[in-house]
Curated annotation (Swiss-Prot):
Stored CDD domains: FMT_core_Met-tRNA-FMT_N (cd08646), Met_tRNA_FMT_C (cd08704)
The keyword Zinc-finger belongs to this UniProt entry's keyword annotation: no
Binding site for (6S)-5,6,7,8-tetrahydrofolate: S114, L115, L116, P117
Protein family (similarity comment): Belongs to the Fmt family.
Highest taxon in the source lineage: Bacteria
UniProt gene name: fmt
UniProt function note: Attaches a formyl group to the free amino group of methionyl-tRNA(fMet). The formyl group appears to play a dual role in the initiator identity of N-formylmethionyl-tRNA by promoting its recognition by IF2 and preventing the misappropriation of this tRNA by the elongation apparatus.
Disulfide bonds: none
UniProt protein name: Methionyl-tRNA formyltransferase
Keywords per UniProt: Protein biosynthesis, Transferase
Length: 320
């Protein structure tokens, strides 16, 4: 089949790489415009664009597809002229109007990083960890105009481990998503079968995965240790959990475990021990967490042994 692929980050590039190994023809790739990145703020192509260029696939980077503007209408017409059988969308980042969704012969299929209708929206991986879900997965759906509202065609399941961060779970789901879309697109007959058997989402089970904001990542010591640990893992690798030491300086916290230490009448935020495991801190409900990797402003992330050597934190200190 002739496939258009639309995606931007690594999650999408993993799926594109898998599709490139099939007998299908990737006739075009759509991705977001190049963005400034790194210390030099150089314009950098997305991971999907880089992969497409390596395979000499034409790359399109429209700003939008709004028919109300000349450029949006031109982008729609350009896509239609490609004559695709199907369009695969994974973390593309642009809203696709109904006119685009209806253009390919079999419509547009989306690779979504959750078990829909749970965690529709921008941050399904992070919200699943922060909420304490014990399982997530991939849903392949036929796209509709609403936000992740399309009919479901295929699901795979992925347990969430107690040590999973958004970074590790992202990689697991990216691999699952790649396998899932290849299964659905094994042949034109397979695609027709999954389209015929697609399932409407139960709106009563809908939960939204709202976009992350940096302020959420500030650690609240009044929460119990289990929730603090979930948040630390959910916000790794972005925006990274932090302790606001003073107005201008934040201590980033990359990893943690539930502490086996305890102290009677400890104040929330109080450091009760520093040892080879890390920095043990009192949380709400008389629970305790151990910070195992932290990063001071301008420095590198440190492990437990390195944290102790800095002597920047001390037992009895109350973290804000």
């Amino acid at each position: 089949m002739k496939i258009i692929f639309a995606g931007t980050p690594e999650f999408a590039a993993t799926a594109l790489a898998a599709l490139l190994k099939t007998s299908h023809e990737i006739i075009a790739v759509y991705t977001q415009p190049d963005r400034k990145a790194g210390r030099g703020q150089k314009l950098t192509p997305s991971p999907v664009k880089q992969l497409a260029l390596e395979h000499n696939i034409p790359v399109y980077q429209p700003l939008h597809f709004k028919a109300s503007t000349e450029e949006g209408l031109a982008a729609q017409q350009e896509l239609a002229a490609l004559g695709a059988d199907v369009m695969v969308v994974a973390a593309y980042g642009l809203i696709l109007p109904q006119a685009v969704l209806d253009t390919p012969k079999y419509g547009c299929l989306n690779i979504h990083g959750s078990l829909l209708p749970r965690w529709r929206g921008a941050a399904p991986i992070q919200r699943a960890i922060a909420t304490g879900d014990d399982e997530t997965g991939i849903t392949i759906m036929q796209m509709a105009a609403g936000l992740d509202t399309g009919d479901m065609m295929y699901k795979t399941y992925c347990p969430i481990a107690s040590e999973d961060t958004s970074a590790t779970l992202h990689d697991k789901l990216a691999a699952q998503g790649a396998t899932a879309i290849c299964a659905v697109l094994e042949s034109e007959e397979t695609l027709q079968k999954y389209l015929a058997e697609r399932e409407v989402q139960d709106e009563s089970l809908t939960v939204y995965a709202h976009k992350l904001v940096k302020s959420e990542a500030r650690i609240d010591w009044s929460m119990n240790a289990v929730q603090v640990d979930r948040n630390i893992r959910a916000f790794n690798p972005w925006p990274v959990a932090f302790i606001q030491l003073d107005e201008n300086n934040a201590l980033r916290v990359w990893n943690s475990i539930i502490s086996s230490q305890s102290k009677v009448n400890a104040q929330a935020g109080e450091i009760i021990a520093i040892d080879k495991q890390g920095v043990h801190v009192a949380c709400g409900e008389n629970t305790f967490i151990c910070l195992t990797s932290v990063q001071w402003p301008g420095g590198k992330a440190l492990n437990a042994q390195q944290i102790a050597q800095t002597q920047k934190l001390h037992v009895g200190q109350i973290l804000p």
